[in-house]
């Protein structure tokens, strides 16, 4: 397994989407940038907000695409092409309906599970699914008919606090991820529940 060299947080651009559940992946990268005291800045060549940080002794590229979710792959592919990154050097943070708020999971490879941002990313990477994922639990509304409104809705105060607590725990596991200690990172994160 290759070392993670870039962390990408998926979401939708604009203030009307900033606080929606679908932007939970972007919240991870924004929190990491704040923790690193390095602001994300608009970078046209990567179609998003970008920063290079030094975190836990590693140089890491951070990106929040400013494309809409279903076009995230364009930004991911642009970053990979510019820095000669392979898909297995990426950690992509995204919202996950199948996990409760207050929890998060790492995953290696796999399908898109109906997530439009992942679907477009897989396509833009030539159908290479070998990237790592950081799945941020947002819970499920209970009915497939309610999913679109749910992911584009804002979590309540307690739900957002639980999601933020899970993101904080993600940041505490990132040094292990960057060191290649996936077992340690997974063991810690997967046992956390806010």
UniProtKB/Swiss-Prot annotation:
The record marks 95 as: Stabilizes the basic form of H active site to accept a proton. It is an enzyme of class 3 (hydrolase). It comes from the Bacteria. Keywords: Cytoplasm, Hydrolase, RNA-binding, tRNA-binding. One of its GO terms (cellular component) is cytoplasm. One of its GO terms (biological process) is rescue of stalled ribosome. Its EC number is 3.1.1.29. The active site is at 22 (proton acceptor). The record marks 12 as: Discriminates between blocked and unblocked aminoacyl-tRNA. This is Peptidyl-tRNA hydrolase. It comes from Chromohalobacter salexigens (strain ATCC BAA-138 / DSM 3043 / CIP 106854 / NCIMB 13768 / 1H11). The gene is pth.
